[in-house]
Amino acid sequence: MIRLSKRQIILLHDQLVEETGGMSGIRDDGLLESAIAAPFQSFGGEDVYPSIQQKAARLGYGIIKNHCFLDGNKRIGTHAMLIFLELNGIELTYTQVELYQIIISVASGESDDKKLLEWLLNHETWKAKYTKDFSWGFYCTNNIQ
């Protein structure tokens, strides 16, 4: 599994702010570290968030709700979540309006990380896969058990 580092998220934030406007800078370093670490917590040797989708939802939710940055928390939370999914082979299909609605819902407190996870799962893209025995099969990247 590919993880985004704190440095990568800060660089992504700086790039977003430069391109879309707003203030650059971290408001609370501890809250940023917490948001980045939360998806990878374990308890009793088991991941609290075992699937890639669960980790992505928790990452996006944590950055948005922790208000780690001076500005652009919704933008970077969304961007980090989507990049994390893409880096780990999960593709989504959605409109900008759908994405906007779920992110505003999370930011306002109307939706939690479970609702965000549900949204991610409902927007996963099904892919065609060519198997070893030269037959075509279809699979969804959803690996929640």
Region roles according to the model:
Residues 1-145:
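FIC/Doc superfamily catalytic core
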